[in-house]
Amino acid sequence: MILFSIPVKDGFFSFNVDNGSVLFAGSRYGRLDPKVAKGLVDRFGRLGFSFLTGCANGVDESFRLALSESDYTDSTTVACAFEERTYKLKGIFSLFVVPSGLSPKVALAKRTLWMTCRCSLLVLFPSDPIGKGSALAFKSAIYNNKPVFVVTETKPEETDLFSVYKSNLFGIVDGYWCIPPVYKETGLCYEAG
């Protein structure tokens, strides 16, 4: 279990995450500074996390590159919505995770749902305003009681499904933790499932 603590007005809000897999996702049109992607991979890797990311351009591609050049290649899965992409990705484990014959839109959505069901937490780099794919990843993670760190300047609107805490992730990126209510009650994510 990994403890995350977020400074709040009267102390800290802390929650534990099973150190399973961290999912990196975000905009197909965004690119990350390689130092950001490598820094996050290194920090989560040292905590014992394995990694999930997608096969798309943009944020996925930034993390695939960082992961392929890291010490954590053996603990990485790239989830692909299109079988031909699994053959193009070299040096990193890629897996075709949706049924054949789906429309591209449906295949991408199913791939996103596959990843969010298998991660312990989501680190999301959406466009502003948030795109459909990032919105689906966010909602799916929250509905599956997974904490989400959203790298954005725009504070997500708090709902009954999650609380929002402004924070910084490892001194690398600023954003907001979106925490499902189960964490507030127990502090433990694995009790949610």
Regions found by a protein language model. Name each.
Residues 193:
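Cysteine-nucleophile amide-bond enzymes
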Residues 25:
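Residue-level detector of conserved, well-ordered beta-strand and adjacent loop positions
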Residues 2-19, 28-175, 181, 187-190:
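Acidic/glycine-enriched connector segments
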